[in-house]
């Protein structure tokens, strides 16, 4: 008589008789094999697409897998479902070649001169990922010369992110646009949306409205009253704060700067702070600083009244931590830093502005201090700083840590920064501009996981120990961390063209900058 099997024995024995084998690389290998047959050996083409006289030998299966437009075409009762040759009229041959490259290879070289056509055609052919990337590219490169055209385009394609970027450019450069053909032919509803969104007084929006009406007065006079009623003018606000010290004083100073569109920068205010500022950020129109004789204390400077108010202190003392504003949650996050015992911290806490309360949340993957921080769509990018080595001594860090404020989860990017140690960062659209020790200025694109090193003027070759950076009015401003008294020259970088201009003659008392906030 056979003895009963012990639990789990039959599974072990059956392993030698039969089992299910799952090849985890099978799907990828099949896809590679199909694409090799289609591309390298040019086999099994079953449809010819004719564009401007050029014929593309393609595959219905591949086109349908990537595009709902082609899938519907080939599975419908239309003649295109059965025809061997299909003629497309709404796309140029060069742009269709780019679409074919994308559909078959997953890569495409986007060129500025063809970008708007690729944007429109990728939406028409329902290539969603390509359409979204074109939208991001257009939003990054929108400028005075094309903002109205891009705004019109985004409106037609129901693209709110691109529309907002183009509208912001239009309303802040309205004085330059008001006599252009694009502005004078602008549809009424787009003009209304621009002027009702808050146009700076310096852009003379009333003159722009009159110019638009007078271009076709007979038909547009009826809109005059509604346009004047819709107009919302806003004053010029302070955009950048410098926090630092004068060589002869121990107290920190907060200097507010007004950055005008004509590249001029003027000092619009100055306030005395406490002895030692350990962290600072700008949230909305207010300035928040942490430090003083008790390092956990926090103050807010109300920009409207220029009064300092005490806020709830941090739960514990921290030095060299990073403060980052997250407007979408109306919160300020404090990340990393050092304890008073000089131990690196991986703590993350956030301050709910409306409730005046600090709350602890999950920790960083790696404890760091003195890192640069940048908020991009609710994700905080913590860049560089100092971390512990294997012997628990500190070393310059090249890590990029990403803290998601929606999920309260942190992860470290699988790649590192092109430089290490202390750095400063500013967000422009969906890019992070990073300046480090020496003459390094890098544009980091988190969506593409790419870095671009920017060319800088020769003046940067004699760089100080560290530069500071801020994003304001669609430009990147770069400041020295040390100045001679009364010498506060700064550089202004246009992200769209990489052109650099120098702003001279800012009269401030600061000789040592600690923070630059925008």
UniProtKB/Swiss-Prot annotation:
Pfam families associated with the record: BACK, BTB, Kelch_2
Coiled coil: none
SMART domains, alphabetized: BACK, BTB
Residues of the BACK domain: 147-239
Keywords: Kelch repeat, Repeat
Gene3D superfamilies: 1.25.40.420, Kelch-type beta propeller (2.120.10.80), Potassium Channel Kv1.1, Chain A (3.30.710.10)
CDD domains reported in the protein's UniProt record: BACK_KBTBD4 (cd18481), BTB_POZ_KBTBD4 (cd18272)
Listed InterPro entries: BACK, BTB-kelch_protein, BTB/POZ_dom, KBTBD4, KBTBD4_BACK, KBTBD4_BTB_POZ, Kelch-typ_b-propeller, Kelch_2
Domain of life: Eukaryota
Domain (BTB) ranges: 45-112
Residue ranges of Kelch repeats: 239-285, 286-328, 331-378, 380-430, 432-481
PROSITE patterns, per the entry: BTB (PS50097)
Binding partners and assembly: Component of the BCR(KBTBD4) E3 ubiquitin ligase complex, at least composed of CUL3, KBTBD4 and RBX1.
Reported function: Substrate-specific adapter of a BCR (BTB-CUL3-RBX1) E3 ubiquitin ligase complex which targets CoREST corepressor complex components RCOR1, KDM1A/LSD1 and HDAC2 for proteasomal degradation. RCOR1 is likely to be the primary target while degradation of KDM1A and HDAC2 is likely due to their association with RCOR1. Also targets RCOR3, MIER2 and MIER3 for proteasomal degradation as well as associated proteins ZNF217 and RREB1. Degradation is dependent on the presence of an ELM2 domain in the target proteins.
PANTHER family: KELCH REPEAT AND BTB DOMAIN-CONTAINING PROTEIN 4
Protein name: Kelch repeat and BTB domain-containing protein 4
Upper lineage: Eukaryota, Metazoa, Chordata, Craniata, Vertebrata
């Amino acid at each position: 008589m056979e003895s009963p099997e012990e639990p789990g024995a039959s599974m072990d024995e059956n392993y030698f008789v039969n089992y299910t084998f799952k090849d985890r690389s099978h799907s990828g290998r099949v896809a590679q094999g199909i694409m090799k047959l289609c591309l390298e050996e040019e086999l099994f083409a079953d449809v010819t697409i004719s564009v401007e006289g050029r014929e593309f030998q393609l595959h219905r299966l591949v086109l349908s897998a990537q595009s709902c437009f082609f899938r519907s075409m080939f599975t419908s009762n239309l003649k295109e479902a059965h025809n061997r040759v299909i003629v497309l009229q709404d796309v140029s041959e060069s742009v269709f070649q780019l679409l074919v490259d994308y559909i078959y290879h997953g890569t495409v070289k986007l060129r500025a001169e063809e970008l708007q056509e690729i944007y429109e055609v990728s939406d028409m052919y329902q290539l969603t990922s390509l359409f979204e990337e074109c939208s991001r590219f257009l939003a990054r490169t929108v400028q005075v010369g094309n903002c109205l055209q891009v705004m019109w385009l985004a409106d037609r394609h129901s693209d709110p992110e691109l529309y907002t970027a183009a509208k912001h450019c239009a309303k802040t450069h309205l004085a330059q646009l008001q006599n252009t053909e694009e502005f004078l032919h602008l549809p009424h509803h787009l003009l209304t949306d621009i002027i009702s969104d808050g146009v700076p007084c310096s852009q003379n929006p009333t003159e722009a409205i009159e110019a638009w009406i007078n271009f076709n007065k007979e038909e547009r006079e009826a809109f005059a009253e509604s346009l004047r009623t819709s107009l919302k003018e806003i004053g010029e606000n302070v955009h950048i704060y410098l926090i630092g010290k004068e060589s002869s004083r121990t107290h920190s100073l907060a200097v507010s700067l007004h950055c005008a569109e004509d590249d001029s920068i003027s000092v619009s205010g100055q306030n005395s702070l406490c002895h030692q500022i350990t962290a600072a950020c700008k949230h909305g129109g207010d300035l928040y600083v942490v430090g003083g004789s008790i390092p956990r204390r926090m103050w807010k400077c109300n920009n409207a009244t220029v009064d300092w108010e005490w806020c709830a202190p941090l739960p514990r003392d921290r030095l060299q931590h990073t403060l980052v504003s997250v407007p979408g949650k109306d919160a300020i996050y404090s990340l990393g830093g050092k304890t008073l015992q000089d131990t690196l911290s991986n703590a993350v806490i956030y301050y709910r502005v409306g409730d005046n309360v600090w709350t602890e949340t999950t920790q960083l993957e790696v404890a760091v201090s003195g890192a640069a921080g940048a908020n991009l769509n609710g994700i905080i990018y913590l860049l560089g700083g100092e971390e512990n080595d294997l012997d628990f001594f500190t070393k310059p860090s090249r890590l990029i840590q990403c803290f998601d404020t929606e999920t309260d989860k942190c992860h470290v990017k699988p790649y590192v920064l092109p430089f290490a140690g202390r750095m400063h960062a500013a967000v422009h659209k969906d890019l992070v501009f990073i300046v480090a020790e020496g003459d390094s200025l890098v544009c980091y694109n988190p969506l593409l996981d790419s870095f671009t090193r920017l060319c800088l003027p020769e003046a940067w070759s004699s760089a100080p120990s560290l530069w500071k950076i801020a994003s304001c009015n669609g430009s990147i401003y770069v400041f020295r961390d040390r100045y001679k008294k009364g010498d506060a020259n700064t550089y202004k970088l246009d992200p769209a063209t990489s052109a650099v201009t120098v702003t001279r003659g800012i009269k401030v008392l600061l000789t040592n900058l600690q923070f630059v906030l925008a």
